[in-house]
Amino acid sequence: MARYTGPSCRLCRRENMELFLKGERCYTDKCAIKRRNYPPGQHGQGRPKVSNYGIQLREKQKVRRIYGVLEKQFRSYFEEADRMRGVTGENLLSLLERRLDNVVYRLGFASSRTEARILVRHNHFTLNGRKANIPSIQLKAGDVVVLKEKSRKIACINESLDAVVRRGTPQWLELDKEGYKGVVKLLPAREDIAMPIQEQLIVELYSK
């Protein structure tokens, strides 16, 4: 499956919630879900009855799109979460949250996960003092993410850092805005993920 390159707002309307795929626009009245709160397409406003399987599938698609992960990789995350101790659904969300691109977004260096992924791939960050340009790198407690010196004058990064006050930084992360540095204080718990996700539906889908 190829990466989706169409209109981001269309995905939000399809999942009937804000996925925050377009950065600051998602916090304004220009957000598509606020203007047209129904699925895209000719029959979008009809909202037909959805089966249990359809509900489970939509939940999985929603989470995939939030984190920008393709199906094969998402399935791998689920299988890894299933092997871990604890609750499979919570393990899955923890693995997704600990991706480097998501941590960069959560710290406020980018206004969206898509933007964070681009910044990571273009070598703007170091992880524990070493080059890190793979968005899917799994971070652990104690890891330190630093924006490189040459990248600290990039306007969009500084604008995102200024806006992070409104969005807030999760409890499991610590941001040193002046030093352009973030630290993973501890692994994210389920209560640290405030998005309306029903991870048990994903577990049920993959367990069939």
Curated annotation (Swiss-Prot):
<dbReference type="InterPro" id="IPR002942">
    <property type="entry name" value="S4_RNA-bd"/>
</dbReference>
<keyword id="KW-0694">RNA-binding</keyword>
<keyword id="KW-0689">Ribosomal protein</keyword>
<dbReference type="GO" id="GO:0006412">
    <property type="term" value="P:translation"/>
</dbReference>
<dbReference type="InterPro" id="IPR018079">
    <property type="entry name" value="Ribosomal_uS4_CS"/>
</dbReference>
<dbReference type="GO" id="GO:0003735">
    <property type="term" value="F:structural constituent of ribosome"/>
</dbReference>
<feature type="domain" description="S4 RNA-binding">
    <location>
        <begin position="98"/>
        <end position="158"/>
    </location>
</feature>
<dbReference type="InterPro" id="IPR001912">
    <property type="entry name" value="Ribosomal_uS4_N"/>
</dbReference>
<dbReference type="GO" id="GO:0015935">
    <property type="term" value="C:small ribosomal subunit"/>
</dbReference>
<comment type="function">
    <text>With S5 and S12 plays an important role in translational accuracy.</text>
</comment>
<dbReference type="InterPro" id="IPR022801">
    <property type="entry name" value="Ribosomal_uS4"/>
</dbReference>
<dbReference type="InterPro" id="IPR005709">
    <property type="entry name" value="Ribosomal_uS4_bac-type"/>
</dbReference>
<dbReference type="InterPro" id="IPR036986">
    <property type="entry name" value="S4_RNA-bd_sf"/>
</dbReference>
<dbReference type="Pfam" id="PF00163">
    <property type="entry name" value="Ribosomal_S4"/>
</dbReference>
<keyword id="KW-0699">rRNA-binding</keyword>
<protein>
    <recommendedName>
        <fullName>Small ribosomal subunit protein uS4</fullName>
    </recommendedName>
</protein>
<comment type="subunit">
    <text>Part of the 30S ribosomal subunit. Contacts protein S5. The interaction surface between S4 and S5 is involved in control of translational fidelity.</text>
</comment>
<comment type="similarity">
    <text>Belongs to the universal ribosomal protein uS4 family.</text>
</comment>
<dbReference type="GO" id="GO:0042274">
    <property type="term" value="P:ribosomal small subunit biogenesis"/>
</dbReference>
<keyword id="KW-0687">Ribonucleoprotein</keyword>
<dbReference type="Pfam" id="PF01479">
    <property type="entry name" value="S4"/>
</dbReference>
<dbReference type="GO" id="GO:0019843">
    <property type="term" value="F:rRNA binding"/>
</dbReference>
<comment type="function">
    <text>One of the primary rRNA binding proteins, it binds directly to 16S rRNA where it nucleates assembly of the body of the 30S subunit.</text>
</comment>
